[in-house]
């Protein structure tokens, strides 16, 4: 059977959580000999929609955080399992084109980590236009607005403790599967800290702070860097993964050109090695990055989130001892430096990450989907 993995691509491929999660899931299916295709759902709406959506997303998260936060709150208020939102009807507009593509290419399973394709597939199934198995992967540690107005066969959620929230929002309990959020196998096969540092050329006799800014360099990275440099000594090196934000990287490189312990790096495919090498990690609380950090078992400090679902990510991680954070930038830095200087606290955090993390989620997702397919085929033969 064939699997179609549908995302909403709003950043360059390999830099967005949705894209990464589907790439990871695709690898697991292909290991089992199951062909897959990745698709950007808005390509079915128009050729320009994906690029436009990407620009709007970047503007809303970098330039208009308050607007984004307000929209998220409004979404929670108007979202309902019974009444359909404008989001639902907007995604219904291209659903027929999506339906034709799925039918013509013979796909019988659709996997989605984003609301938009889930809304479109819901419309198709309500109109009885398409008979395929559908699966939604939640990519944050909360039930995001409008999830409850979707109707798919199963919802893969990050943790069983979140089931109550999804049920309260209207998702049937029997449709919830607490697999975790899929992460790459690279995070499951990490070298030790010393070996990772040797591979990356990081001093083995210094403290190492890793800062991940996100693919767009979101957040007040310049201020945080200045404060971390000011409050640490020559025995502490700071490695900044600058993502695709060229302006940010140039600013930092110019400012710290004469500071040998500040290293500003371009987009890298070796984030897993940097996590393995680091003593502590400062990162924005995205669902995938946070899950990767737990899989890597690195002491985790969450910076100020994008308003909305990332606030819920911080709450889940801090309540379970898997990260520390603060209400202000200064509080975040102070908690991070305290963690850096406390090996026992780091060890305790790793124990919590071991207890609550689900590093084998990608395998669990694929195994569940394959199991459902096999069960359906067996039932059909009996009939």
Predicted regions and their residues:
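A nucleotide-sugar donor-handling region in carbohydrate enzymes
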Residues: 153-215, 245-247
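A short, well-ordered alpha-helix in the C-terminal region of glycosyltransferases
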Residues: 345-359
